[in-house]
Structures are given as structure tokens and as C-alpha cells.
Amino acid sequence: MKYHILIVPTALRVLAEIPDRRVQKILQERIDALSHDPEKQGKALTGELAGCRSVRAAGQRYRIIFRIDRGRVMVLVLALGMRKEGDRKDVYVLAKKLLRLRLI
């Protein structure tokens, strides 16, 4: 079954602001690949991001955080960005902040 992909505006903005067009293309291709068997891709997240999944992209540096809505056969891309463990600009830190503020 093929899933429809929906990218939230904040994730679209982050994608558009990546200066390297090759990285943008790789991320877009990885997002498109989520339309086929998204449950088998990436890993399930815990804690504040429970119910979401994360996949690596662009040479393991970037993460794409998404949620699967089986009822509407849709993958909702909530956030994407660089993995910078311990940094306040880390993609997981930003995704948690957006969820707390109910912006995604």
C-alpha cells in the first residue's frame, strides 16, 4: 500500500534553507521513499516523541522525524535537520520544542 506524504510547513522551510542542493535532493528522495512501507523504516522514538519514527539520511548526518497515520494512509513529516547531539539546534531538541508549543 502506498502512503501519501505530507510535510509540515516548518519542515518544508528547513528543507528549503539547506544551502547544499545535493543534500536537499537526497533528503527529498528519502522522504519520498517513506511512501512505501513506512512502518519498516527507521526506528520508533520514545519519550516526548513517542508515536513518531526517525530515519537517517544524507550520510547519517540528517534525521527525518515522521508520524504514520494508518487511518488516512498518510505519513506526516514533522521535522528534519542535522543530528547535533548535545546542541540546542539538534533536530530532536527542536522537534520536542515544536511539539511542546503545539506547532506541529
Predicted feature residues:
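Arg/Lys-rich, positively charged N-terminal/basic patches that mediate binding to nucleic acids
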Residues: 1-30, 104
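Enriched for short, Lys/Arg-rich terminal
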Residues: 4, 13, 67-104
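Amphipathic alpha-helical interface surfaces
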Residues: 23, 27-30, 41, 45, ...
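Short proline/glycine- and basic residue-enriched helix-capping loop/turn segments at helix->loop/beta transitions
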Residues: 34-35, 39
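Basic/aromatic recognition patch in beta-strand/loop cores that engages polyanionic ligands
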Residues: 40-85
